[in-house]
Amino acid sequence: MSDLMTEQKRYYAERAPEYDDWWYRRGRYALEPRALERWHADAAEAEDALEAFPPGRSVLELAAGTGIWTRKLVRLADRVVAVDANAETLALNTSDAELVQADVFEWESGERFDLVFFSFWLSHVPDVRFDEFWAHVRAALAPDDRVFLVDSGAGETGHTGTDQAGGEETRSLSDGRTFRIVKRRWLPDELAERVRRLGFELDLHDSANGHFLYGGGALA
């Protein structure tokens, strides 16, 4: 599993210059107009849910990547600490956040935040490290603080990738190179039950057109 996680980390480092093409549906991720309208509607649904949550004054964003959601968070919170393992992705993130290059499984802030946020990360956490990751989330929260996540919907196929057995996926870059990554698409009820056993109570939803899973909650 460590080899797979190393390959996944390298994939996202190499993908950094083209990562945003997926979110903005450019190039090989382009959609025909009606499909693009559905994509934008789902993105707006998730964004509106985050804004209505709302984040609070201080936010810890884990696996922040190139900053697609960081830029939304800095408009909603007074302070955002954005952590990612790759310098290549953080170089494209926003200077309005406090950027930290670190492995999210190892980094400890020693602080408590009003909100812990992560987008399109949980589906890349291997099952053997799932509980460990949520322990890190818990450590960054005071009892009344909260968590919010956005991820791929269970039926989402918007990436250029091939599903493999055992929660893996083969992804390709625009230059043709391929990488293996972890990828598990969760159903809302399935994920809510899994984290409930770890002491979190989350209200999770699929977006109207099925592209995203999103929602939040707090320690139970």
Write out the residue ranges for each language-model feature.
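A short glycine-rich, Lys/Arg-flanked "PGG" loop and its adjoining helix->strand segment in the class I
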Residues: D131-P143
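C-terminal alpha-helical "lid/dimerization" subdomain adjacent to the S-adenosyl-L-methionine
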Residues: V150-R197, H205
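A conserved beta-strand element that flanks and buttresses the S-adenosyl-L-methionine
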Residues: F117
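Conserved class I S-adenosyl-L-methionine
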Residues: M1-P54
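Conserved S-adenosyl-L-methionine
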Residues: F200-F212
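Short catalytic micro-motifs in class I SAM-dependent methyltransferases
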Residues: F120-H124
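Class I SAM-dependent methyltransferase SAM/SAH-binding core
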Residues: L60-W107
